[in-house]
C-alpha cells in the first residue's frame, strides 16, 4: 500500500512522462555506480597482482551484466498480453523467431530460433554440424541481426572461408589452378557483400568459459545480439574444477543464462559419444557426451546423423529434433553438399506424422 501511495503521489505531481524520465535517470545512476564499483574492484585486483587477463575478463563481464536490459519482474497481465500477441503473430504467419534458412526445420521449431533459448546441435565428427552452424549464422546475418561465432577449433579466417563458400557456392581451392572461369568474380562479389554483414568471430586461443563470457560481453556492449554460436561445447573448460561432469554442468547452465541475460538465441554445438558408431543405431539424447546437464539446460536438442541408405552423389542427413520445449519433436531430412558446406531441405520428409521416429 505504501508503494502504491508513492506511485500515485509521483503520478499526480510529475505526470506519467516525467516519471518515465525519472526512472531512466535512476537506471543511469545505477549503471554509473556499477561501473564505479567494477573499476574499484579492478584496481584492488591489480594491487593484489592478479593476472591482467583475468582482471579484464571479470571487469567486462560485470559491466555487461549490469547493463542488461532484461527486467527482473514482469506482471502476469503484461506477460499474458505479450504471449497472446505472439500467438496471433504465429497464427498470422509471422514470427519474431530467427529463421534457420531451412523452412521445414523452422516449422518444427515454431518459426526458428527464439530469444532467451539455448539450442544444442549434436553429431559425430564429419557429419556437418559446424557447416550447418555456419549456414545458420549466414541466414541470421542476412536478416540484419548481429551474430557472434565463437569457434574453439577454427581461426576467424577458416570460419570466414566456410562462410564464403556457403554463400557463393564456390568450393575452397585444393590445388593450383583449381578455380574455374567466373569463380574469382563470384568470390570477389561475395567478399564485397560480406563487408557489411553483422558477424564477428572469436579469434584467440582461449578456451575457458570465462574467456568466452568476456568475448560475448564485449560484443553485447556494442549492441544487441540475435544469435550466438559456440563451436563446440566440450572444448570449453573451467579451470579449478575437479569433475568433468560438474564442469559441463556449469558450462551448459552458463550458456542458458547468457541466452536469457543477453535476450538472444544461443546455438551450442556438441559431440555425441564415440560408442554410437559401433552400435548401428540412430543417436538419442543419452548419446550426448556428459549428457545429463546439457539435456536438462537446453530448450531444444537437434541430433544429426547420416541416412543409412546413402546416395553416392550426395550426403543425406537426418536432423532429429529430439527435445523441443516449445514445439514438436520430430525429424527432417536435409541434403548436405559437402564441397560448399551447403544444406537444403529434402522431399519427402521422414516420418513427419510420427511423434518421434527415433
Residue map of PLM features:
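Cytosolic-facing regulatory segments adjacent to core modules
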Residues: 107, 139-224, 238, 331-335, ...
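C-terminal regions of RecA-like/P-loop NTPase motor modules
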Residues: 209-228, 254-262, 275-358
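Short, well-ordered beta-strand core segments
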Residues: 147, 266, 301-303
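Short, small/acidic-rich helices and loops at N termini and domain boundaries
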Residues: 1-91, 115, 126-127, 169
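The Walker A/P-loop phosphate-binding site
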Residues: 71-170, 189, 357-358
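Helical hairpin unit composed of two closely spaced alpha helices linked by a short loop
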Residues: 225-268
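Amphipathic alpha-helical transducer elements in NTP-driven molecular machines
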Residues: 16-19, 32, 99-102, 106, ...
Amino acid at each position: 500500500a505504501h508503494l502504491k501511495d508513492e506511485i500515485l503521489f509521483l503520478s499526480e505531481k510529475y505526470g506519467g512522462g516525467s516519471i518515465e524520465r525519472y526512472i531512466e535517470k535512476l537506471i543511469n545512476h545505477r549503471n554509473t555506480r556499477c561501473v564505479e564499483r567494477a573499476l574499484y574492484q579492478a584496481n584492488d585486483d591489480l594491487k593484489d597482482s592478479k593476472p591482467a587477463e583475468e582482471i579484464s575478463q571479470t571487469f567486462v563481464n560485470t559491466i555487461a551484466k549490469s547493463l542488461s536490459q532484461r527486467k527482473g519482474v514482469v506482471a502476469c497481465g503484461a506477460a499474458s498480453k505479450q504471449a497472446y500477441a505472439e500467438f496471433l503473430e504465429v497464427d498470422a504467419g509471422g514470427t519474431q523467431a530467427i529463421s534457420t534458412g531451412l523452412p521445414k526445420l523452422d516449422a518444427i521449431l515454431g518459426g526458428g530460433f527464439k530469444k532467451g533459448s539455448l539450442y544444442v546441435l549434436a553429431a559425430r565428427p564429419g557429419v556437418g554440424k559446424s557447416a550447418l552452424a555456419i549456414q545458420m549464422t549466414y541466414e541470421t546475418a542476412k536478416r540484419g541481426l548481429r551474430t557472434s561465432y565463437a569457434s574453439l577449433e577454427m581461426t576467424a579466417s577458416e570460419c570466414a572461408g566456410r562462410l564464403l563458400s556457403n554463400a557463393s557456392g564456390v568450393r575452397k581451392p585444393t590445388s593450383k589452378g583449381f578455380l574455374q572461369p567466373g569463380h574469382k568474380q563470384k568470390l570477389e562479389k561475395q567478399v564485397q557483400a560480406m563487408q557489411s554483414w553483422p558477424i564477428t568471430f572469436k579469434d584467440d586461443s582461449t578456451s575457458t568459459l570465462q574467456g568466452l563470457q568476456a568475448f560475448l560481453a564485449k560484443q553485447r556492449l556494442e549492441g544487441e545480439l540475435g544469435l550466438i554460436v559456440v563451436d563446440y561445447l566440450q572444448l570449453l573448460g573451467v579451470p579449478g574444477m575437479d569433475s568433468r561432469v560438474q564442469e559441463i554442468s556449469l558450462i551448459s547452465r552458463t550458456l542458458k543464462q547468457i541466452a536469457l541475460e543477453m535476450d538472444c538465441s544461443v546455438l551450442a554445438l556438441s559431440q555425441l559419444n564415440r560408442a554410437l558408431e559401433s552400435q548401428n543405431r540412430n543417436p538419442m539424447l543419452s548419446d550426448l557426451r556428459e549428457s545429463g546437464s546439457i539435456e536438462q539446460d537446453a530448450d531444444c536438442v537437434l541430433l544429426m546423423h547420416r541416412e543409412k541408405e546413402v546416395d553416392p552423389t550426395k550426403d543425406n542427413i537426418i536432423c532429429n529434433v529430439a527435445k523441443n520445449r516449445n514445439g514438436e519433436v520430430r525429424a527432417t531430412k536435409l541434403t548436405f553438399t559437402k564441397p560448399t558446406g551447403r544444406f537444403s531441405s529434402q522431399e519427402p520428409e521422414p516420418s513427419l506424422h510420427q511423434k518421434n521416429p527415433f
